[in-house]
Amino acid sequence: MGYIRRPAYYKAFRCIGSDCTENCCIGWEIDVDEDSLAYYETVPGDFGERLRASIAPADEQTGEPAHFRLDAEERCPLLNDCNLCEVLLHLGEDKMAQICTDHPRYYEWFSDGREDGLGLCCEAAAELILAQTGAPAFDVTEADGVSETGTEAETELENVLFSMRDALFRLACEDAPFDDKADRLYRTANAQQEQYDDLLFPFPEGEDEDADETDEDTASWSQAFWRESTLTSLLELLLGFEINKDDWRTLLTGAKARLPEIIARRNDFLQAYQGKRHEYDNLLTYFLYRHFMKALGDDAVQDKVQLALVSTAVIQLLDVYEWLAKGEVTHWAQICICKAYSREIEYNEDNTEQLAAFSVLDEME
């Protein structure tokens, strides 16, 4: 019997349906899984015909799966004028495509269990993520449907990474200024990468494995990140990604135009919003929980921490821009910035890989 691990807030999540301002049936190409597709072929009557006409078949040449065709306004054709799903209304929730049932939930499978989470792109999920206080809490349950399939070596390697991530969680929630915390996380990640490499590729017995202290062991990640040259390069990288919605481009170009002022006034912003600094702790924890264990696939431990640091710092950068532009950062504005970042970055693997590889310290050279 395996386990399922979830953030403690996971069980509180409820889709707000037609009240959502960022409808996940608008602007997203929604794939149709094979089981749902097979069922939809059997639905009778006028609705069945309209349902099938709304689906673009899979393309064997490109590998693109079957998906709902978006209309001219980039809406799912089965989203009615009240922003309610007609599949749900006509056939029931259990007949919705798998991605529609799951979103914004995501799942990561391991040798003897699974981790579930909620994506920051959803405003109801973002509300829960930002609201947490104190150290991150998780619910772990045994699950009949999750089997133990891994080898002892695979499980051991996973446990090493889980332990490393727990250490990062503790650092992320320390009562310390954001920059000090970011520097400690970066240095810890550098040490963890060395430990992980030693585990995977141990030195032959008798060979000296001690290494001299490197610049990365002592460098200030925050000092390097908050330089105008670094932020200019980073924003240009973000603007070069495929952009889904214009509000994201507007945020990035606005921030880029005011970088000197953002850098100069950032400490004033952090002082003014000191009561909400736990939100950045929560974001660090969220990005670490969602992405760190992917190091099992590429052994890039440090890159996963870099992704969490850059992601959280970019959101903070946009918060400062919002504060300068409008005189305040409302709770709703913070949710909008977070969900825009997640929508534009986290659901494109190329984007996350490039941000994870973006070398902040190299920008100082």
Say what each PLM segment does:
Residues 2-22, 111, 124-126, 130, ...:
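Long, low-complexity, compositionally biased intrinsically disordered regions
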Residues 17, 21, 161, 165, ...:
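Short runs of predominantly hydrophobic/aromatic residues within well-ordered alpha helices
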Residues 51-65, 180-185, 328:
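Short glycine-rich, low-complexity/disordered patches
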Residues 175-365:
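Hydrophobic, aromatic-lined core segments that form the binding pocket/scaffold
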Residues 83, 90-183:
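Internal, well-ordered alpha/beta segment that forms a basic, Gly-enriched binding/recognition surface
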Residues 22, 26-59:
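A structured, charge-rich N-terminal accessory region that forms the first stable segment of a protein
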Residues 2-20, 55-97, 114:
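Immediate flanking context of iron-sulfur cluster ligation sites
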